[in-house]
Amino acid sequence: MTQRPERPSEQDGFFWKTKTLEQMSSSEWESLCDGCARCCLEKLEDEDTGDIYFTHVSCRLLDAGLCACKDYANRSEQVSDCVRLTPDNVRTLNWLPPSCGYRLVAEGRDLYWWHPLISGDPNTVHEAGVSVRGRVRGTEDEIPDSELEDHIAQWPVRLPKRAQLKKPPRS
């Protein structure tokens, strides 16, 4: 009797299910980013409650159409308060959106259907309505800090219904 070939695990190829954040290669780490660019929005913190409020205002380096940094390699030199995500800080940053791939994996949760690692398509994050595309009203250079309260946005802390589905909606 010949031995049956081992059935491949459903987790084969899903490195985020089998590795800790610290075990990931730099390319695996970078690929956890879904490209929503919500982390590139200006945020306000309520001094009394600690609540975080996202705004419609982006970092000056964000290309709001592409949802990508215009100078990713040098972002920390260009923007002094740019936060580089690491395995340590993604576990403690309270402003990462609930849909953030880094946050989900750090919490032991799976990625959504629209994440490019699941869908194979970098546009599904936009199609699901999760990204900042079409929602940025200006950059930090264009809108003064004194006006940020006028630009508070509710959507970054919620997922659109279609993004919450287990699989993509039928067209």
Swiss-Prot record:
Record NCBIfam families: PRK05170.1-5, PRK05170.2-5
InterPro entries given in the database record: Puta_zinc/iron-chelating_dom, UCP006173
Protein name as catalogued: UPF0260 protein Nham_1404
Family in the record: Belongs to the UPF0260 family.
Pfam name, any one: CxxCxxCC
Domain of life from the UniProt record: Bacteria
Matches recorded under HAMAP family: UPF0260
Species of provenance: Nitrobacter hamburgensis (strain DSM 10229 / NCIMB 13809 / X14)
